[in-house]
Amino acid sequence: MSASSLLEQRPKGQGNKVQNGSVHQKDGLNDDDFEPYLSPQARPNNAYTAMSDSYLPSYYSPSIGFSYSLGEAAWSTGGDTAMPYLTSYGQLSNGEPHFLPDAMFGQPGALGSTPFLGQHGFNFFPSGIDFSAWGNNSSQGQSTQSSGYSSNYAYAPSSLGGAMIDGQSAFANETLNKAPGMNTIDQGMAALKLGSTEVASNVPKVVGSAVGSGSITSNIVASNSLPPATIAPPKPASWADIASKPAKQQPKLKTKNGIAGSSLPPPPIKHNMDIGTWDNKGPVAKAPSQALVQNIGQPTQGSPQHVGQQANNSPPVAQASVGQQTQPLPPPPPQPAQLSVQQQAAQPTRWVAPRNRGSGFGHNGVDGNGVGQSQAGSGSTPSEPHPVLEKLRSINNYNPKDFDWNLKHGRVFIIKSYSEDDIHRSIKYNIWCSTEHGNKRLDAAYRSMNGKGPVYLLFSVNGSGHFCGVAEMKSAVDYNTCAGVWSQDKWKGRFDVRWIFVKDVPNSQLRHIRLENNENKPVTNSRDTQEVPLEKAKQVLKIIASYKHTTSIFDDFSHYEKRQEEEESVKKERQGRGK
């Protein structure tokens, strides 16, 4: 019998086993030739549930019986390695391909093992641990399709305390929380995240997790969870516990003379701004630490400009200073050395007057009201007044009461001096000299006024904390003349001035006045030759003119006279050596 006759005798309807298949033959080809490629063969009596049905798979038996349980399959990882595993493969059933994953791409199912064609999932558990009973509880199939990567990963039992937890399952409000080892996971997660005993459901989700799922949290738990025995919550510490601990005793520092560091603070920092030592020129006198204790009758020095040289003054100068201190009232009892040193340490970086003027200032730069104050309008008169000072007072009317501070025309500048030595010599010789830039600015201002108004200069020593006087510029700058009287040889040029006020006015009296042309800074925070606007200058001049001062540089005039004589003798010795 030929093949064609067999085809003719074949009953109708058997040409294609697929219901929707073609019924027409084309070009002598039979549709049966394409059956292996078009669709799998339909098996009769297939009573298995669909793949999406994840509720009743445990009620059906496998289609093929095996002599061993797949749950007893040997582990291929060689130990309890805490690493994620892909979900299980489907069991071999009637020639079906065994490599098809049952829940790889978003199929719902509990514990990442949705059964394939009604078969039990491969659960990676050793014998005796069977989770088939879990298929009946409400937790099975609770993973919704909204989960971005549902049932993608599962974890080894060793890393989760014996329970295989779906990588995307949410721990809150599910019966999976009842699984063995969940306390360990919660405690480990709490120790990892918060360091407390809160449950993992209270931990905020990590930014970047997949569509509101707990996969990242589960991954962290699987790789970092620790047994409860190793979790040690931090011991709470209260302020009472901290206060009850004894303080560590600091070793007492001792000076070169063996005096305890608690009674003698360290001396002030010595900068390279000493008078007569500019650019390492002139003698550099170092004051021994004993000088602070021996000079009890002298107020302490806090200025880095005067500590080195004024501590080594000759005895006549020291005697003269004592006379200035005790002139207005009987001499007070000598102060202890420790009190004198404490006064110095209170202002280690502030300038303090070298003699009697130190008692006129408080620690905050405000004038004090203690004993030994001079009368308003003049400095304290020494027991033996210096003849140069007497001559200056007879010629000049310092601190006039009828000063006209309400200027209609005029310009006012701030002058910052490196030392009071130069202030003393400016008063003595009625001259002044600024930097090259400052001289040009002052000279231009003086020439611009052309006699229409005064040019006032407000003097202040760097770091002194007060203004020491006001002078009027009386001539243009002579750039070709060098006065040769300044404590430093760096100044070139000179111009004449007339001193009007010689008094110490603390910065606290003027700090509220701010300059709009200097970043709105206080007038006390100005640089050399900083111009003060006229309206603000009127306020400054009014305060200086009306301030009842208690100290001035006249109190130390004899001291600075002696210093000038010493400097001149040193210069003569240098000139003699140079010849």
From Swiss-Prot:
The modification Phosphoserine is found at S2, S4, S5, S22, S39, S196, S359, S394. Residues 291-316, 372-383 have a biased composition (Polar residues). GO terms for molecular function: C5-methylcytidine-containing RNA reader activity; mRNA binding; N6-methyladenosine-containing RNA reader activity. InterPro entries: YTH_domain, YTH_prot. The modification N-acetylserine is found at S2. Keywords: Acetylation, Cell cycle, Cell division, Cytoplasm, Differentiation, Immunity, Innate immunity, Mitosis, Nucleus, Oogenesis, Phosphoprotein, RNA-binding, Spermatogenesis, Ubl conjugation. One of its GO terms (biological process) is regulation of meiotic cell cycle process involved in oocyte maturation. GO terms for cellular component: cytoplasm; cytoplasmic stress granule; cytosol; nucleus; P-body. Residues 385-579 are annotated as: Interaction with m6A-containing mRNAs. Interacts with CNOT1; interaction is direct and promotes recruitment of the CCR4-NOT complex. Interacts with YTHDF3. Interacts with RIDA/HRSP12; interaction leads to recruitment of the ribonuclease P/MRP complex. The disordered regions have the ability to interact with each other and to 'phase separate' into liquid droplets within the cytosol following binding to mRNAs containing multiple m6A-modified residues. This leads to the partition of m6A-containing mRNAs into membraneless compartments, where mRNAs may be stored, degraded or used to transport mRNAs to dendritic arbors in neurons. Specifically recognizes and binds N6-methyladenosine (m6A)-containing RNAs, and regulates their stability. M6A is a modification present at internal sites of mRNAs and some non-coding RNAs and plays a role in mRNA stability and processing. Acts as a regulator of mRNA stability by promoting degradation of m6A-containing mRNAs via interaction with the CCR4-NOT and ribonuclease P/MRP complexes, depending on the context. The YTHDF paralogs (YTHDF1, YTHDF2 and YTHDF3) share m6A-containing mRNAs targets and act redundantly to mediate mRNA degradation and cellular differentiation. This is YTH domain-containing family protein 2. It comes from Macaca fascicularis. The gene is YTHDF2.
